[in-house]
Amino acid sequence: MKRIAVLTSGGDAPGMNAAIRAVVRKAISEGIEVYGINHGYAGMVAGDIFPLTSASVGDKIGRGGTFLYSARYPEFAQVEGQLAGIEQLKKFGIEGVVVIGGDGSYHGAMRLTEHGFPAVGLPGTIDNDIVGTDFTIGFDTAVSTVVDALDKIRDTSSSHNRTFVVEVMGRNAGDIALNAGIAAGADDISIPELEFKFENVVNNINKGYEKGKNHHIIIVAEGVMTGEEFATKLKEAGYKGDLRVSVLGHIQRGGSPTARDRVLASRMGARAVELLRDGIGGVAVGIRNEELVESPILGTAEEGALFSLTTEGGIKVNNPHKAGLELYRLNSALNNLNLN
């Protein structure tokens, strides 16, 4: 393989630029030319494709976002869009593609491979909801951003004897909420993977007041409901105290990537080039127990929920390589809470 391309697709994540940099420089070291595709699959179909050099990725490793830009392009789910994209790639002499993004991006990469065009996926999403990897590019930075915000919210919460409901991102996964909540010492964490009762949340807050605690931080993952809806439900369940809502929003996607995300992205980017060099496509690179692994890309595009309740009321672990259930129980133990 003499020429490959790299694109970013879907929601941006800190560390994407570090991954692009690794792809470019590893490929050059292997004697492979690299082209960048602007705006994801939309740019592929439009032919917005250009050569990248080592200088093109200079000083990019610490930048948030993606300098190749990103976009959602549902038209690529159709065969016509896929074939149009492949036609453009062939015009530029490109023989393989590295796709950095989430599960929607992975589906596009799989379609390319099915049409005989090798594609390798890298998990770029703050949600950490990709099966086949312990961590995704951008997750660590997002958690750090949320923890920093929670520390600041705690300052004002304690000054006014208030309870704050803080809504965080994660789509249908509770990874950000769990990890940031543990790190920031949140009093309660609500995630979409497990059911809970608002009455129990109110009781736990009241128990805190009885023990002399004058403020509380409640984390709610966006996959549960909005922060405003959650606050309303708390009031309906009997909460009488001063209650405020903070929605952290898109600051969770921005910012300079942490050292961990930079290293992870660099390792994954280099591995993607090695796979394409060897003619391997249709796989996604992940990390498990600190070792790089590859998985069939179609399987990794499934929902990455950590765990869920069974019909009998037990807990089913959907991805044993993630520590979600352990963290949920840890938070309950640290705050003397009931599991539900």
Curated annotation (Swiss-Prot):
Residues bound to Mg(2+) are 103
Q: Per the record, what are the reactions this protein catalyses?
A: beta-D-fructose 6-phosphate + ATP = beta-D-fructose 1,6-bisphosphate + ADP + H(+)
- Recorded metabolic or biological pathway in which this protein acts: Carbohydrate degradation; glycolysis; D-glyceraldehyde 3-phosphate and glycerone phosphate from D-glucose: step 3/4
What organism does the UniProt record list as the source? Lactococcus lactis subsp. lactis
- Which named protein is this? ATP-dependent 6-phosphofructokinase
Q: Name one GO biological process term.
A: canonical glycolysis
Describe the family membership recorded for this protein in Swiss-Prot or TrEMBL.
Belongs to the phosphofructokinase type A (PFKA) family. ATP-dependent PFK group I subfamily. Prokaryotic clade 'B1' sub-subfamily.
Q: Where does ATP bind?
A: 11, 72-73, 102-105
Would I find Metal-binding among this entry's keywords? yes
Tell me the residue numbers annotated for binding substrate.
Answer: 125-127, 162, 169-171, 222, 244, 250-253
The domain of life is Bacteria
The protein's job, in short, is:
Catalyzes the phosphorylation of D-fructose 6-phosphate to fructose 1,6-bisphosphate by ATP, the first committing step of glycolysis.
The record's annotation in HAMAP family points to: Phosphofructokinase_I_B1
**The UniProt record lists the keyword Manganese:** no
Description of how activity is regulated:
Allosterically activated by ADP and other diphosphonucleosides, and allosterically inhibited by phosphoenolpyruvate.
Coiled-coil residues: none
Positions that bind ADP? 21-25, 154, 185-187, 211, 213-215
Q: Name one GO molecular function term.
A: AMP binding
* Active site residues of this protein: 127
Gene3D superfamilies, sorted: 3.40.50.450, Phosphofructokinase domain
